[in-house]
């Protein structure tokens, strides 16, 4: 009888090995028997988070969501055949290859911010006799960025373009901020406000390589605390996910946003009121924005990238809305 548990363990280990193969280490540990097998199978096989933990390339191979949510370098099939085309929004591009990808021109070539894929393309020189230059683009993942999800969903107006000054509320560790930095380019500025200190540290280290990003570790509810750092801006982007989100946006818009400036807001219904359906929450928030002199231009759901999220584009009318 002493041999039977071992045989069960071996069988389980075999399962772990075969299923854990996606996760690198998960598979190799699976062969050791009982516990190793079960851990190898359950962790390595599922791809989303387990795959990325299991090995260096687990996330990118783990599955459709696993790859999108940020495996080490998953997502793009590039190569010499990639063609870069401009998107309808200035500063945003589409990389056409085996699959079409949303990309931005990398402000810091050679640097990856959150493990995203980079695509290098040779662009011919405008002058005769000058060799072509290599330009690097970064893949903008709509599963990791609400703004990218909105662009993929077909936003008509963005207000974020080369040379613009943008106030970004709720910058987190700088995933989307880095792409906004790419879009506005060296002539533009991104003021990135984040209250939490841990992602704030990552935001600061990202900003060290991008001269057009100004990180501000401060509460967006108190814009007077960073008024000496921020000038008048062309657009405010907000992804703060707080119940008083509309008030936070209004305070910052009144203080920093120029007349007729753009407001781009990502609304997460559950963070504002989880007792009613998402459409009701969105309608209430849009009405609050109207009361704060922000004229809504369009509203777009972020399906299939985010559930119960929408993005609202508005224009700030400093003189007030016409009735």
Curated annotation (Swiss-Prot):
Gene Ontology CC, one term: box C/D methylation guide snoRNP complex
Family label: Belongs to the methyltransferase superfamily. Fibrillarin family.
Transmembrane residue ranges: none
EC numbers on record: 2.1.1.-
Post-translational modifications reported in the UniProt record: By homology to other fibrillarins, some or all of the N-terminal domain arginines are modified to asymmetric dimethylarginine (DMA).
NCBIfam families in alphabetical order: PRK04266.1-2
Top class in the EC scheme: transferase
GO molecular function terms noted in the UniProt entry: histone H2AQ104 methyltransferase activity; RNA binding; rRNA methyltransferase activity
Region (Disordered), start-end ranges: 1-80
Gene3D superfamilies, per database record: Phosphorylase Kinase, domain 1 (3.30.200.20), Vaccinia Virus protein VP39 (3.40.50.150)
Modified residues (Asymmetric dimethylarginine): 8, 12, 15, 19, 25, 29, 35, 39, 43, 49, 53, 57, 61, 65, 69, 73
UniProt function note: S-adenosyl-L-methionine-dependent methyltransferase that has the ability to methylate both RNAs and proteins. Involved in pre-rRNA processing. Utilizes the methyl donor S-adenosyl-L-methionine to catalyze the site-specific 2'-hydroxyl methylation of ribose moieties in pre-ribosomal RNA. Site specificity is provided by a guide RNA that base pairs with the substrate. Methylation occurs at a characteristic distance from the sequence involved in base pairing with the guide RNA.
Protein name: rRNA 2'-O-methyltransferase fibrillarin
Binding site for S-adenosyl-L-methionine: 175-176, 194-195, 219-220, 239-242
Top-level division of the source organism's lineage: Eukaryota
InterPro entries: Fibrillarin, Fibrillarin_CS, SAM-dependent_MTases_sf
Keyword tags: Methylation, Methyltransferase, Nucleus, Ribonucleoprotein, RNA-binding, rRNA processing, S-adenosyl-L-methionine, Transferase
Extent of Gly residues compositional bias: 7-78
GO biological process annotation, one example: box C/D sno(s)RNA 3'-end processing
Subunit structure: Component of box C/D small nucleolar ribonucleoprotein (snoRNP) particles that contain SNU13, NOP1, SIK1/NOP56 and NOP58, plus a guide RNA.
